[in-house]
Amino acid sequence: MKPIFIVALLFSTCLVNAKPSINDADIKREPEPNVAVPPCGDCYQQVGNTCVRVPSLCPARKREPEPNVAVPPCGDCYQQVGNTCVRVPSLCPARKREPEPNVAVPPCGDCYQQVGNTCVRVPSLCPARKREPEPNVAVPPCGDCYQQVGNTCVRVPSLCPARKREPENQDLWS
């Protein structure tokens, strides 16, 4: 609204609502003319002291055409057709396959390290081998007069059988 119109409207409202200090009965007032202040605009017609909107008096509104843009804009594989996006496979980039994780199945054991999808033996990763102690057996086993002590045979005379003594000075050829 224009500032002049607002001022005039406020002024007229104040005049209508103002109470005169003199009694209304004492003063003869002339009737106010049937004119709307300010005058009615384009789409309005004066009816009594008011303006009434009459649509047939209004000029046609000019509508701004909406731009033919899809909101949000179309993505990689899509092309705008009117206000919509249509999928066009030829516009799609080649799909990137996710590489399979580099995990050996089954997972590598103690002495092995994964290289790519395979397990490679790494001796430094191997735990020290526990050697089984050799049994405490002398090789060859101890004979008649001997007893095993650790890995050796020790002669024990008490284990020896009594020797048969051959007669002395016997002629062997007779």
Curated annotation (Swiss-Prot):
This is U-stichotoxin-Hau2a. Residues 1-18 form the signal peptide. Its main location: secreted. Disulfide bonds join C40-C51, C43-C58, C74-C85, C77-C92, C108-C119, C111-C126, C142-C153, C145-C160. CDD domains: Ugr_9a-1-like. GO terms for cellular component: extracellular region; nematocyst. It comes from the Eukaryota. Neurotoxin that paralyzes freshwater crabs at high concentration. Coiled coil: none annotated. The modification Hydroxyproline is found at P39, P73, P107, P141. Keywords: Cleavage on pair of basic residues, Disulfide bond, Hydroxylation, Nematocyst, Neurotoxin, Repeat, Secreted, Signal, Toxin. It is found in: Secreted; Nematocyst. Belongs to the sea anemone BBH family. Residues 19-33, 61-67, 95-101, 129-135, 163-174 form a propeptide.
